[in-house]
Amino acid sequence: MFGYIKIYKPELLVRDYTRYRSLYCAVCKSLGRQFGQLPRLSVSYEATFLALFFLSFRENEKEARDEACIANPLVKHPVAAPDPLIDFASLVTAALVYGKGQDDLEDGQWFRALPQLALFRKAAGTLRKEAPELVDEIELALHELRAFERMELSLCQGREAACAHPADKLGTALSEQVRKRAETAAAYSGRVLRAVMSETARRAEVSGEWLAKLQGIFEIMGTALGEWIYFADALDDAEKDAAKGRFNPFMGLSAIERLALAEQLMRKREETLDAHAALLPYYKDAAIVQNVICEGLPRERARLADKSRAFLKHEVQV
């Protein structure tokens, strides 16, 4: 769920990379101020992108300051100035980590779940106080997603023959069924990111006139990004989920078919993000936003595809 929304550093100018890194460090320091030092280990690219994206519509911003880091206290580098928007991006993504911990707990992954629940319980409580309607939307979407996943897993286990054979042996009907299942499941994740983007936009000091015009674009992008992350996570975990009998939206497909479908679905969301990001009136950092969407996402998709192909090659050799 986290760690997929990355820049592609070789295509960034030095000043743009310095800016991105300053925001990444600011998010990390914000986590430390709000929740203590250990949660800083969870600093994510997703929180950094959320802060970067909405700060790009703000004309004025305090200058970055040279600061040392707990990981490298002897060397100072630019860190973006503290900002309520950075704090909110840190808070909301930390609360989502808590939600992921609850999901892992339901899956029986105690070793992963308990540290997340312990470290980010405060974040979940703080977000509920600050944005109760957002939390209600997130919790409803995640609850419905878990219910859908349990239902689909039960159905699949009830027809093991269909789920154990590649779709090419059963015709295209199963492939289409899996596509619909994957898109339905991803839509819940899309609802989460749409709600997050919408709430963050309201806090981003975008003028009322602009906010009214841009809110629809933000929500479309949030939906597409949430769905892309869901597909990325599903592709990344497909082999582990199959081995442990857990739900995966691509279950029932052969490895080759799974990869083809995942790439197709992810490309479609990348196209949506690219088309709508191009419509936005940035004051700054447009090149970094474009780098993430047009370079970072496709290359992360390619990395996941290469991982799947490597597993498939190993499986064939065995």
Regions found by a protein language model. Give the residues of each.
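A glycine-rich phosphate-binding loop feature that marks nucleotide/adenosyl-phosphate handling sites
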Residues: Q290-E295
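C-terminal transmembrane module of eukaryotic multi-pass membrane proteins
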Residues: L273, I288-V289
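Acidic catalytic motifs of isoprenoid enzymes
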Residues: M1-S189, M197-I220, F231-R267, A278-D285, ...
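Surface-exposed charge patches
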Residues: E227, A275
